[in-house]
Swiss-Prot record:
Gene: ST2300
Native source species: Sulfurisphaera tokodaii (strain DSM 16993 / JCM 10545 / NBRC 100140 / 7) (Sulfolobus tokodaii)
Motif (YPITP motif): 253-257
The organism's place on the tree of life at top rank: Archaea
Protein name: 2-oxoacid:ferredoxin oxidoreductase 1, subunit alpha
Subunit note: Heterodimer composed of an alpha and a beta subunit.
Keyword annotations from UniProtKB, A to Z: Oxidoreductase, Pyruvate
Length: 627
């Protein structure tokens, strides 16, 4: 069973909260959910929507086609009516609204919709869009949201303005009734979201007054499987991973979609801290600093790391561009700092609230000169949690910056994660070569066989840090022999990491290893491809790359042998993964499925693309799904 549900309305009217309540309630009934929220770079007023896929087994993707659409305004109907295939819940008050009256809609999109409706013989109003949907076997459910909101206001004896947002509860209540699930799960989800009695009572009345508007359609039954599951988004997964992994300092400058991670850490600062030297535990807090800009943010994190605490920062493309100067300083001084890089659409400001995978090559080679950096890329929320910890361990073990890539899709999507996938029993801190103190002979940049020097914290020994090339003590040096040796010392750490980190842990492989088709991907498209692999008849081996530096070249090269087609699936124009594969293995990728319109890969559009590539032999397919 797989069902697609979408809720949409004006940004700032509680769409995200309503979707989370609905998702929580469905998950509580035992179902798996994958959800993604899309929103404009606008505080209030523009179109926002949340897509949820509900299934009785693990699900990792959404589709373009919608089973149930919940709309509150005219724009949501106009934006999504074409994709609805079963039920469309709409606001009765907007039926006569003309598309030209929707000022918030992109003019290009409005013209396309007007042209479509006109050619199909319908008027360019909400009514016309609804008639088209009805003619295509969609069940229409008109709702008088204002009437229910007024009824609740009268019953609660509060102004109508107070009950405005119960309209969202009406929409999700009707949806929940259509599913046929026990309404008590919905009430519990509402009460866990709202803490004030007034709002709890208001919303419970809204549930009561709207529950009988429709009859059950899907007749879902609560799952009998008793399993511990988490329902969380990518920002939260990374934040919890950092807290669990021992971060004690987090700096940031507000930027979408990275800020939510730091806000979560700030709200959960109280932790049990462990002394890195003695292992003693005591209560403490995580320091979270909102810096004046991104360069200050990374410099603060670097300074904190030098004192011995696990330190990190979080940013997105424009912010990372500003951090690069500090990144180079950290590379020169072998500072174990972690940067969580939330990828959004560029260049420049680009698409601030939309997704992309265009920043892949950039972080691997960011900075002037050459210095080692480890680059990880998470593919789902469980990986995002574990990779946040892995990044901290790698940074300290190899005394080098680590960049953790998380796309906007992963950051702002939600899923139900089985507890065991987090593998908490396998997670532990690895702090590398730490010395409690150093005498006069201590050399912070001592030459060693593996390039990794014993690390003392500030205040524990005499040491010098500078952006210039330096000798073992840290003093500035332009000596030719020292320059060669110190440069090699730094770069050798990446070679050591390449030898020590098993290539099998830097990738994940799914499907039939003997397939003639190999698909190479990374990040969020992995989940879409896994769903296709598990539920469709496509024949391919799926290779997910989880670490791009050091690149798992030997394993990737071996997996490419004997294939008819080697296909990359990624969210950028240049097929950057194929460029890296060619660079590291010397082998060519034969086909690419690409997308750069700012929206995530959707299962149905990707299935169509795979047919074009695998069966029809197209070399390059560009996708443009989403709204």
């Amino acid at each position: 069973m797989r069902l697609s549900w979408v809720i949409g309305g004006a940004q700032g009217t509680g769409i995200d909260t309503a979707a989370n309540i609905f998702g929580n309630a469905v998950a509580s009934a035992g179902y798996y959910i994958y959800g993604n929220r899309e929103y404009y770079s606008n505080i209030k007023g523009r179109h926002s929507y949340f897509s949820l896929t509900i299934s009785d087994k693990r699900v990792r993707s959404n589709t373009q086609k919608i089973d149930i659409l919940v709309s509150f305004d005219a724009e949501t109907v106009f934006q999504h009516f074409y994709d609805v295939k079963d039920i469309l819940i709409y606001n009765k008050a907007v039926e006569t609204t003309k598309i030209d009256a929707v000022q918030s809609m992109e003019p290009e999109l409005a013209e396309r919709i007007k042209d479509f409706l006109t050619k199909q013989g319908y008027e360019t109003t909400v009514k016309g869009a609804l008639e088209y949907a009805s003619k295509n076997n969609v069940t229409l459910i008109p709702v008088n949201y204002d009437e229910i909101a007024k009824k609740v206001a009268d019953e609660m004896k509060v102004p109508l303005s107070v009950t405005e947002r119960v309209k969202n509860i009406v929409g999700i209540t009707i949806s929940y009734k259509l599913l046929g699930l026990d309404v008590n799960y919905l009430i519990e989800a509402i009460n866990s979201t709202f803490k004030q009695d007034l709002y709890r009572k208001m919303n419970e009345l809204a549930v009561k007054d709207s529950y009988d508007i429709v009859e059950s359609r899907y007749n879902l039954k609560p799952s009998s499987k008793e399993r511990r599951r988490f329902w969380l988004d990518g920002n939260t997964a990374v934040a919890i991973g950092k807290i669990y992994g021992g971060v004690r300092f987090q700096s940031y400058y507000p930027i979408t979609p990275a800020s939510d991670e730091s806000v979560y850490i700030e709200a959960h600062q109280d932790v049990l801290m462990e002394d890195p030297i003695t292992g003693d535990k005591k209560k403490g807090t995580i320091v979270v600093v909102q810096a004046e800009d991104e360069l200050a943010a990374i410099n603060m994190a670097i300074g904190a790391a030098l004192t011995g605490v696990r330190a990190a920062t979080a940013t997105s493309g424009p912010g990372f561009s500003l951090m690069v100067e500090g990144l180079g300083w950290a590379g020169m001084n072998e500072v174990p700092v972690v940067i969580t890089y939330y990828i959004r659409g560029g260049p420049s400001t680009g698409l601030p609230t939309r997704t992309a995978q265009s920043d892949l090559i950039f972080p691997i080679f960011a900075g002037h000169g050459e210095f080692p950096k480890i680059v990880l890329a998470s593919g789902d929320h469980a990986e995002a949690f574990k990779d946040a910890i892995w990044a901290l361990n790698l940074a300290e073990k190899y005394q080098t910056p680590v960049i953790h890539l998380v796309e906007k899709t992963l950051a702002n999507s939600y899923s139900t994660i089985p507890y065991e996938e987090l593998e908490l029993d396998k997670l532990k801190a690895e702090r590398g070569k730490i010395v409690e103190s150093g005498d006069i002979s201590y050399k912070r940049f001592k030459f060693t066989e593996d390039g990794i020097s014993p690390r003392a914290f500030l205040g524990k020994a005499t040491m010098y840090y500078t952006g210039d090339e330096h000798n073992e003590e840290g003093h500035i040096s332009e000596d030719v022999v020292n320059r060669t040796m110190m440069y090699e010392k730094r770069m050798k750490k990446l070679e050591v990491a390449d030898k020590e980190i098993p290539e099998e842990s830097r990738v994940k492989i799914y499907g039939d290893l003997n397939s003639r088709n190999l698909i190479i991907t990374w990040g969020s498209p992995t989940g879409v491809l896994r769903d296709i692999l598990e539920e469709s008849n496509f024949d391919f081996t799926l290779l997910q790359i989880r670490m791009f530096s050091p690149f798992p070249k030997n394993l990737v090269s071996k997996l490419m042998e004997g294939r008819d087609k080697i296909i990359t699936v990624e969210g950028n124009y240049l097929a950057q993964t194929s460029l890296l594969v060619k660079m590291y293995t010397g082998k060519d990728v034969t086909n690419s499925i690409l997308k750069w319109n700012g929206r995530p890969f959707l299962r149905d559009e990707l299935e169509e693309a795979l047919i074009k590539v695998i069966k029809d032999g197209e070399k390059r397919v560009v996708l443009n799904g989403g709204i």
